[in-house]
Amino acid sequence: MAVEKVNSSSSLAEVIDRILDKGIVIDAWVRVSLVGIELLSIEARVVIASVETYLKYAEAVGLTASAAVPAA
């Protein structure tokens, strides 16, 4: 995948359009411990994408119902 280098500034609408078109995944993991005792553990994966982009990639990795049904 090639990286495009653009010298002009982007508007907020262009940035949001690009994020929805390509998608972005934020993976976070937090653990709070006190004296070796785990008090809190949080794991989160946030996916930001358009429905079309999500379905395209979800089908490619087998996360949709249509991908789970074998072809007859």
Swiss-Prot record:
Principal location listed in the UniProt entry: other
Keyword Hydrolase on entry: no
GO function terms (MF aspect): structural molecule activity
GO cellular component labels: gas vesicle shell; vesicle membrane
Intracellular or extracellular location(s): Gas vesicle shell
InterPro entries noted in UniProt: Gas-vesicle_GvpA-like, Gas_vesicle_GvpA, GvpA, GvpA-like_CS
Induction: Constitutively transcribed at low light (5 umol photon m(-2) sec(-1)), transcripts decrease rapidly on a shift to 50 umol photon m(-2) sec(-1).
Top-rank lineage group of the source organism: Bacteria
Miscellaneous note of the record: Gas vesicles are 65 nm wide and between 300 and 2000 nm long in this organism.
Family of this protein: Belongs to the gas vesicle GvpA family.
Subunit description: The gas vesicle shell is 2 nm thick and consists of a single layer of this protein. It forms helical ribs nearly perpendicular to the long axis of the vesicle.
Record PANTHER family: GAS VESICLE PROTEIN A1, GAS VESICLE STRUCTURAL PROTEIN 2-RELATED
Name of the protein: Gas vesicle protein A
Gene it is expressed from: gvpA
